[in-house]
Amino acid sequence: IEFSEMIEPLIQEETFFIVSSKSFSTDETLQSIELSKEWSGMKCDFDKHFIAITSQPKKAQIFGFSDKNIIQFPNEIGGRYSMWSPISLPAILELGEQFIEFLIGGSLADTQFLNDRKYQEFLKTLSFSDIWYNNFLQKGTRVLLTYSWKMRFFTDYAQQLEMESIGKQPNKDSIFQKTGQVVFGGFGSTAQHSYFQL
């Protein structure tokens, strides 16, 4: 249903698909590829209307993507919210020069982390607090609320970043068996009426 709604106003010959999938094995992604190919039909040259962004180029080739239409990124990079990787291509196309400004901001944050000892200590303290609360105080959840409208999707980003990346199986010999917390939250002025009640 969602796919049908999205393509309804589109013209097949003028539509370009960017398939972003780290593994090229997620059911929803593969179904979307098939639906897109079916919708495009004979009116479109597949190579001119589809590219793939993935860490698994051989799997993309199985679905008909040619080498020239596959943008590869390292397997170590997360598949979602990977702003610093080719996964961000749709955002680059949409935002243009604004995305360059965003990258400059990211570079400034990296530079601050590398050069500012107080900032490093702050981040270490914050990280160790999470480990302490989770492993020793048994606080397995954390709420993140943002009160800036521009930051309203930050919780979504943090959920994906932390629960996918930090939630991987820990070293079986580590004293820290719980690597991350369950992250909840949203836009503060609306979400506070639910999370703050508990």
Could you say what each language-model-derived stretch is?
Residues 17-21, 71-72:
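Short acidic, glycine/Ser/Thr-rich loop/turn "cap" segments at secondary-structure junctions
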Residues 8, 23, 193-196:
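Glycine-rich, anion-gripping cofactor-binding loops and their flanking helix/strand elements
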Residues 3, 19-22, 26-40, 50-52, ...:
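Extended, hydrophobic alpha-helical segments in both membrane/secreted and soluble proteins
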Residues 1-14:
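Glycine-rich oxoanion-binding loops at beta->alpha junctions
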Residues 7, 33, 103-106:
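A generic alpha-helix structural signal
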Residues 15-17, 142:
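Generic beta-sheet signal
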Residues 14-15, 162:
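Local beta-strand N-terminus motif with an aromatic residue
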Residues 39-198:
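Active-site phosphate/pyrophosphate-binding segments
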